[in-house]
Amino acid sequence: MSSVLRPALSLIVLMSLITGVAYPLVVTGVAQVAFPAQANGSLLYDEAGKVRGSALIAQSFTGDEWFQSRPSAGAFATVASGASNFAPSNPALATRVTEDAAKLANAAQGPVPLALLTTSGSGLDPHLSPEAIAWQAGRVAAARQLPLDKLQALIDASTQRPLIGPPVVNVLTLNMSLNQLPSAPRNAQL
């Protein structure tokens, strides 16, 4: 019996050490050397060195002086991330979308972009399309007393063009860029 049990237990201990200790330490070490910013959460810092968020996780922005992210089914909490899972036929989804559209309709002209009314699969997608950002530009320009062409130039500079997929704008980095402008309102804090 011990001739079978001993090698089996030895293998369990060895594989536990390899897969539970050695492999994670090697991967963490390689990540810290090769991709330190990404390995530490893609954190974004303001000019004072204070962490303002992650480039990978959306945040809620309120106030006309900010570009707003798409809605979150989990109130932008990473622990409760995920979609609402409401079926298209669910009245609760229709009610939420109608209420959100009514709130946003006063902010700009034209129909509200779909990305500002629907949650992403994770509920934490930090990106919006340049069109959804441009739709909000008039409201932000008026609140910050900025010329619209200056704001559009900032949007263009913040637009990311991935190798695969459509162009996107990270809402947090765009809002952080707004605070770098000389006309940033004194009360506008992220």
UniProtKB/Swiss-Prot annotation:
Parts of the chain that traverse the membrane: 11-31
Gene Ontology terms for molecular function: ATP binding; P-type potassium transmembrane transporter activity
Keyword tRNA processing assigned: no
InterPro entries: KdpC
Membrane topology term: Single-pass membrane protein
Compartments, as annotated in UniProt: Cell inner membrane
Sorted UniProt keywords: ATP-binding, Cell inner membrane, Cell membrane, Ion transport, Membrane, Nucleotide-binding, Potassium, Potassium transport, Transmembrane, Transmembrane helix, Transport
Domain of life: Bacteria
Main location: membrane
Cellular component GO terms, alphabetical: plasma membrane
Family matches, as Pfam families: KdpC (PF02669)
Keyword check for Glycoprotein: no
Protein family: Belongs to the KdpC family.
PANTHER family: POTASSIUM-TRANSPORTING ATPASE C CHAIN, POTASSIUM-TRANSPORTING ATPASE KDPC SUBUNIT
Purpose: Part of the high-affinity ATP-driven potassium transport (or Kdp) system, which catalyzes the hydrolysis of ATP coupled with the electrogenic transport of potassium into the cytoplasm. This subunit acts as a catalytic chaperone that increases the ATP-binding affinity of the ATP-hydrolyzing subunit KdpB by the formation of a transient KdpB/KdpC/ATP ternary complex.
Quaternary structure (record): The system is composed of three essential subunits: KdpA, KdpB and KdpC.
HAMAP family with a match to the protein in the record: KdpC
Protein name: Potassium-transporting ATPase KdpC subunit
Organism, scientific name: Pseudomonas syringae pv. tomato (strain ATCC BAA-871 / DC3000)
Classification lineage: Bacteria, Pseudomonadati, Pseudomonadota, Gammaproteobacteria, Pseudomonadales
